[in-house]
Design a protein with these regions (language model features):
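Hydrophobic beta-strand-centered segment that forms part of the acyl-chain substrate-binding groove
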Residues: 63-115, 128-130
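Core beta-strand residues in small-molecule sensory/regulatory alpha/beta domains
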Residues: 91, 119-122
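Generic structural detector for well-ordered beta-strands
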Residues: 32-36, 89, 134
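A structural signal for beta-strand boundary/capping segments at domain termini and interdomain linkers
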Residues: 127-128, 145
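Hot-dog-fold acyl-thioester-processing enzymes
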Residues: 2-83, 140-161
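Conserved GNAT-family N-acetyltransferase fold
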Residues: 56, 118, 131
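Short coil/turn motifs at secondary-structure junctions
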Residues: 109, 121-125, 136-140
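Short hydrophobic alpha-helix segments
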Residues: 131-133, 149
Length: 161
């Protein structure tokens, strides 16, 4: 999966991207991304659903790192986010050279899991993808859900560009 460029992206300040219709007024984390040729399919030259899932995962990872809860740090502490569910609406296509905004925020925070919203849109505001994902924090030794630490909870809800 080609997500290295996303993982090195700089967060955007809230005023630097188009309004996302259903996003909260605060707590949105967003980056710019230009679709590369390597991210498109050979048979149908657009970013396919597997690449888009990679973008959803990458923006979640970057948001966590920006909030002080990087995956490497979680793994060192014996924890990791596991996806329990992705629900993705594909609203339009992305092609090589398209300049996109990837935005994410925490919609609901439970004791051991959260619901994360992700939107992918063109810079002109055209919506391409709407996703909702449930992520569970899992203890790596027991492979069971574990409580989200208060510091991580506060950071994820408050982290935005």
């Amino acid at each position: 999966m080609i997500v290295e460029a996303i993982l090195d992206a700089t967060p955007l300040p809230a005023h630097a991207f188009p309004a996302v219709a259903d996003a909260p007024s605060a707590g949105v984390f967003a980056i710019r991304h230009t679709v590369s040729e390597r991210e498109t399919s050979a048979l149908v030259p657009h970013a396919n659903n597997i690449v888009i899932l990679g973008w959803i995962d990458a923006i979640a990872s970057l948001h966590g790192a920006h909030a002080g809860a990087a995956r490497a740090d979680l793994a060192t502490a014996g924890r990791m986010w596991f996806v329990a569910r992705h629900e993705v609406d594909y609203l339009g296509e992305a092609f090589a050279g398209d300049r996109l905004i990837l935005a994410t925020w925490v919609e609901k925070l439970g004791r051991t899991s959260l619901i994360r919203a992700t939107r992918i849109l063109r810079e002109d505001g055209t919506a391409l993808t709407r996703a909702s994902s449930r992520w569970a924090l899992v203890d790596l030794a027991s492979r069971r859900p574990t409580a989200i630490p208060d510091g991580v909870r506060a950071a994820l809800v408050g982290a935005h560009g």
